[in-house]
Amino acid sequence: MLEVQDIFAACADAYRQTHKLSLMQHKTVNAILNCRTSSLGGHMDVCPKCGDTRISYNSCRNRHCPKCQTLAKERWIDSRKADLLNVGYFHIVFTLPQELNAVIYSNQKDMYNLMFRCVSQTIRELASDPKYLGAATGLTAVLHTWGQNLSFHPHIHCIVPAGGLNKLGKWVDSKKKFFLPVKALSRKFRGKFLALLKLQKPDTDHSLLNDCYNKEWVVYCKPPFKTAACVVEYLGRYTHRVAISNNRLLNFENGQIIFKWRDYKDSNRWKEMSISAAEFIRRFLMHVLPHGFMKIRHYGFLSSRGKQTKLSLCKKLTGASLLPKEKLTTEKLLFKILGRDPQTCRSCGYTGLLRTGLSPPAA
């Protein structure tokens, strides 16, 4: 199967000679190039019964690497199950108009933080309004910066429980079909973002801001989940997704990459796109986040502070389990991912492989 690593191995050096990369972009390229190769060391499993020997090299664990997200995703899903309430959940997505792309990309850390701030305030302020819910809610928000064709398209996915705590400490359920009116969410988000953008970046072109204010911003809310059990599994699709997965890469020949993408504007049809390797690398690296940037955040009673004071009450009021859920071991998570015991020989079925560590080659 064609991988991003193959494209980087063939073209990244030439690309770096003609393009200026940030430190994080350089680190990401190097990590993906070395992922699951002898450069990072690994281990050797030997079956004492039949002698079958298999070598596995270590992953780079870079959060932008298409090969390194599965175990991290399963660990995250497992840890989040303890936070589930026995209510429905809504999926709300906030997007910015493309006219702001240049401003956002040239000030990524500040602008991504501003997006999170405005999204969380918009949801929590409207939820607390008696006209809508009249209760304090919580949410988990995840930043994505890409569109299906690897374009720059910053947006935030939110998973929000269908209700909240009122001032009397009682649980209030939201309406079944929608959490909050989409138009109200869109306009409040637009007003907050543009007002704070003016304060943070006073040199921003005023005509650009006026044009953005006169547009309807896209916010959409998907129908509620029927059960809480599938919420974190669903959210896991978004939390550890990277700009493009290897299974969407179709062909790499004569310096051209062909990949498939879903066109949401054309009835979600799958299409194919052909671009040069240099353009593919440029698009991929646009989505490397600033160093240490937190792309998954929790607010309200799902924040660190909220968990200590209010989450247990919410679980009690909604009939959710109050018992702490036992976290799965790495072995059990691997069994879930692989569908087999990693300590069982794939040749003869014997359980109890002998493992030997393999050090990276000397520099």
List where the protein language model places each region.
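Beta->alpha loop/short-helix hinge microenvironment recognizer with preference
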Residues: M1-A363
